[in-house]
Amino acid sequence: INIILENSLSVYKVDVRKLKELNPDYIITQAHCEVCAVSFSEVENIVSKNLNKNTKIISLQPNTLKDVFDDIKRVAKELNIENEINNNLIKSLSERLKKIKELSSKQKNKPLVACIEWIDPLMIAGNWIPEMVGIAGGENILGKSGNNSHWVKFKEILNQNPEIIIFLPCGFNIEKTKEEVKYLFKQNSEWQSLKAVKNKKLFIADGNQFFNRPGPRLIESLEIFAEIINPSLFNFNHKG
C-alpha cells in the first residue's frame, strides 16, 4: 500500500459491471485525492464508455468546512432537494458546530494536537482537519487549514512535542491502525518521549468512517475531536 501511496495511485477500483447494472442518473465523485478514492478522470472515462450520455457526474473538491457545506448544498440543488436540505440537514449541522465552537472558545489553554493521516511514511492531516481541531479547542501542529495533507519526518513531530496525538489514517479501521501504531512504536522508541504518549493522550480514530470523508459526518468527527481535546466539556458518547 505504501507503493500505491508514493505513486499517487488509488487503492479503490470502480465495479464497472455493478455500475452498468445500476445505470444511475447521477454519480457523485471527487477530484480531491486520487489515492483515497477513484480518480475523477477514471470515473469520467468509465462513464463515457459504459453509461448513457444523460448520466451526470457531480465532482466535489472541498478543502475547508465551508467548502464541504457548499458541496452539500450544490448536490442538493442538482438533485432538486435544496429547500429540504437547507432547512433540515444544513441547519442541524450548523447548530451542532456552533455549540461546540461557543463552548470550546471559553477554554484559555489550547493543547497542541497532532493529527496523523498516514503512518508509514508519516503524513500530517490537512484540509478541514486543522480547522476542526481549532473549533474543538486545540492548536493543530504542522498542518494548515485549507492546505493538503503532507509528509513529515518524525523529528518534526518530536520538535513540536504535541500534548495530544490522534491517528486517523485513511483506509484503515481501528484494529488495523492499532497494529500499525504498535509496529511504529517498536521501530522507534523515541515516540515514548512525547508528552502525548507519557500522559496517555494518544488516540486512535476511524479515519475511514469519519474525518477523511468530506460530508455530513464531519460534524460527528468534530464531536469526537471535542471529546478528545476537552473531555471535561464534551460528552457525545463516541468513545469506545
Where are these predicted regions, by residue range?
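N-terminal ligand-binding lobe of clamshell/alpha-beta domains
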Residues: 1-240
